[in-house]
Regions:
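Short, hydrophobic alpha-helix immediately C-terminal to the catalytic nucleophile
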Residues: 54, 93, 117-121
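Conserved catalytic-core motifs of eukaryotic protein kinase domains, centered on the activation segment
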Residues: 52-54, 77-83, 141-144
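Flexible "cap/lid" loop of the alpha/beta hydrolase fold
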Residues: 117-121, 128-163
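Structural signature of beta-strand start/N-cap positions in the alpha/beta core
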Residues: 39, 63-65, 100-105, 126-129
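Conserved alpha/beta-hydrolase catalytic His-Asp/Glu region
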Residues: 158-175
Length: 175
């Protein structure tokens, strides 16, 4: 198979378009593959939409039923006057409920990753696994304090009680 054949083959597999209502707004999502298989849920990033997964999702349909959502305000979903992490979590849950999924594996890109991370705290039983692609992960301050330059290459935003405490912890790297 040439470098472009797999891409053309993926795009030739057309998804089924569906809608579910969440808090009075229509939320659009796409479905590829047999609904008898385990769920694989794709969540797009900022300024994106469900069709960004058109060439990716078909690669998984031998083992999964793949779904990609248009979060509210994106793609074919309705727009809202107000958006929140909780509303996005409810949209994810509603699609899973519509698909009759009690649990699914999730792959999320960019802003979709932070939305998914938040959704895991609201609907933890829904997530069998979560894969983040190019997403920012913000750790709670109590977890960040355990890192040091000797243990991790993670750049963390530390929270200090005052300016003097912050300045006293400043170190040049490398020393």
């Amino acid at each position: 198979m040439s470098n472009i054949d797999w891409f053309k083959e993926s795009l030739s597999i057309q998804p089924v378009s569906r809608y579910v209502e969440v808090q009075g707004k229509k939320i659009h999502y796409l479905v590829w593959g047999s609904e008898e298989k385990p769920g694989l849920f794709f969540i797009h990033g900022y300024s994106a939409h469900a069709h960004w997964w058109d060439f990716v999702a078909p690669a998984f349909i031998d083992k999964y039923c793949a779904v990609a959502i248009d979060l509210s305000g994106s793609g074919e979903s309705d727009h809202r006057d107000h958006y929140s992490q909780e509303i996005f979590a409810d949209e994810i849950k509603a699609v899973c409920t519509d698909m009759n999924w009690k649990q699914a594996d999730f792959i999320s890109h960019s802003m979709g990753g932070s939305i998914s991370l938040n959704a895991t705290s609201i609907y933890p039983d829904l997530f069998n696994s979560l894969t983040l692609l190019d997403s920012i992960v913000v750790l709670p301050p109590d977890k960040v304090r355990n890192f040091s330059s000797n243990k991790s290459m993670i750049r963390a935003d530390f929270i200090y009680d005052d300016k003097d405490a912050a300045m006293s912890s400043f170190r040049l790297i490398p020393p």
